[in-house]
């Protein structure tokens, strides 16, 4: 009997292999024909044969091997980090993107520091690990929400504009740096976890190659950033000083007749301090940081279930998908929206795993953040959060303790959401525009300024 079962198993394996071979013989030629029509004789083939495309691909290959050598061959961590930073700075300088990436990165750092200050105020028992990836994601979420809230209040109550917000950002940054410096001086070595990093770490060739691919793919977008801007970016994303804040705050009615100017402007409000500068690169380079955050968050979700090695593999795979990476060089809100949606899912999964109320509140914070970034996020974020919420309720996993739950963060996240939506309501009489106009009409809710939303995309 066992011998008969083995024979049957052998026959089934042979049949499976035969089926796979037949499918491969049918699929491979069709795939090759499609690739040839798209990338050889098609429009993409023409683009790939352009000199600037070939030059950039050659640069990326060289960049990959430079990163690979630095990560794989250099064991001393400080020297490895210095080499990677030098390679990155050199590439950005060649492509005239260094200043933009540096300034936008400094603004990201300010948001992280602001969020960290808020988190430490709510985390009295010091449960959250400093300088940890998940902690950093929470800090960025809290800092971004608080900054948008401050800008909304400044616009609503005092009519502050872009210049005032730049000054406010510099003041906040100075205060945070000074306060943190004093904290570190009094904490000693216990408050400086980077002192505990080992001097040398050996990284395998496989892991080094993955990290090198990720860095090269991210810098590929930085290299493309200054070539040209897409239509939607020029249409509204890069013109905040004209279509959002013309000096009197974000609630000033500038008389625009295009529906896109009535969208939820959370990202544009957040980036007011780096808008209206001599180059659009400052705004666009912030999107590259958001795409990097998307890769990191996706890696954290994978690491939560299958470990760090697979997490790096996931990040490598995602960094090679054009649909994800191309969002990093457009001024549209897609990149940060995806980032915040992944952060929301990460904190929901962490709550299911660890049953800490802080994760649940942070998931709600991330959900509210997505609502101010993109009108259609109401559909997709609600679907994702609702599915996770139903799972938590149906499996009876809802456990909530107010202590250490970060519940005070809702004190500025909810007003932030309402204040961004208030701008749309003020200009149109509707809380949301875009694809929701027909829904409002079916419910009998009419636009008080119909030219704003019925004008479609007919003009600026």
Please place each PLM-identified region on the residue numbering:
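Membrane-embedded helix bundles of polyisoprenyl
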Residues: 85-89, 144, 211-215, 286-305, ...
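Membrane-interfacial entry segments at the cytosolic side of transmembrane helices
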Residues: 76-79, 133-134, 157-168, 195-208, ...
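Membrane-embedded, hydrophobic transmembrane alpha-helices
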Residues: 2-195
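Transmembrane helix irregularities
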Residues: 94-97, 157, 277-278, 305-306, ...
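Active-site lumenal/periplasmic loops and adjacent helix-entry segments of GT-C-fold
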Residues: 216-305, 310, 314, 325-331, ...
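Transmembrane signal-anchor helices characteristic of membrane glycosylation enzymes that use polyprenol
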Residues: 22-38, 85-99, 176-179, 204-231, ...
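Membrane-interface micro-motifs in multi-pass membrane enzymes
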Residues: 48-61, 100-104, 263-264, 287, ...
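Membrane-lumen/periplasm interface segments of specific transmembrane helices
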Residues: 390, 403-460
């Amino acid at each position: 009997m066992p011998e008969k079962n083995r024979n049957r198993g052998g026959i089934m394996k042979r049949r499976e292999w035969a089926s796979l071979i037949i499918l491969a013989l049918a699929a491979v030629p069709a795939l090759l024909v499609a690739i040839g029509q798209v990338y050889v004789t098609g429009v993409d083939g023409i683009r790939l044969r352009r000199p600037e495309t070939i030059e950039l691909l050659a640069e990326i290959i060289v960049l990959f091997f430079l990163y690979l050598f630095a990560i794989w061959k250099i064991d001393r961590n400080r020297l490895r980090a210095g080499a990677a930073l030098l390679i990155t700075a050199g590439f950005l300088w060649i492509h005239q993107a260094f200043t933009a990436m540096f300034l936008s990165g400094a603004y990201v750092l300010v948001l992280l520091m602001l969020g960290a200050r808020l988190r430490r105020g709510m985390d009295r028992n010091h449960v959250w690990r400093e300088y940890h990836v998940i902690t950093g994601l929470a800090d960025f979420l809290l800092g971004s929400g608080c900054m948008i809230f401050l800008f909304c209040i400044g616009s609503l109550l005092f009519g502050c504009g872009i210049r005032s917000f730049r000054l406010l950002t510099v003041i906040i940054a100075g205060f945070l740096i000074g306060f943190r410096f004093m904290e570190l001086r009094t904490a000693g070595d216990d408050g400086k976890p980077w002192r505990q990093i080992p001097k040398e770490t050996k990284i395998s060739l496989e892991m080094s190659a993955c990290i090198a691919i990720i860095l090269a793919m991210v810098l590929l977008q930085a290299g493309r950033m200054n070539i040209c801007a897409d239509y939607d970016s020029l249409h509204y994303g890069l013109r905040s000083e004209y279509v959002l804040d013309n000096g009197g705050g974000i609630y000033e009615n500038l008389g625009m007749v295009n529906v896109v100017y009535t969208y939820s402007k959370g990202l544009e409000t957040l980036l007011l301090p780096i808008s209206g500068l001599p180059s659009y690169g400052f705004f666009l380079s912030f999107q590259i940081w958001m795409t990097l955050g998307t890769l990191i968050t996706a890696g954290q979700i994978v690491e939560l279930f299958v470990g760090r090695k697979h997490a790096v593999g996931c990040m490598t795979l995602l960094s090679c998908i054009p649909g994800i990476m191309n969002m990093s060089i457009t001024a549209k809100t897609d990149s940060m929206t995806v980032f915040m949606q992944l952060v929301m899912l990460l904190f929901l999964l962490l709550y299911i795993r660890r049953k800490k109320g802080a994760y649940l509140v942070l998931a709600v914070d991330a959900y509210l953040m997505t609502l101010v970034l993109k009108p259609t996020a109401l559909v997709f974020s609600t679907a994702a959060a609702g599915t996770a919420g139903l799972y938590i309720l149906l499996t009876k996993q809802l456990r909530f303790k107010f202590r250490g739950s970060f519940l005070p963060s809702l004190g500025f996240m909810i007003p932030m959401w309402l204040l961004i939506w208030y701008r749309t309501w003020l200009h149109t009489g509707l809380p949301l525009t875009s694809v929701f106009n027909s829904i409002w009409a079916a419910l009998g809710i009419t636009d008080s300024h119909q030219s704003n939303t019925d004008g479609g995309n007919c003009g600026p």
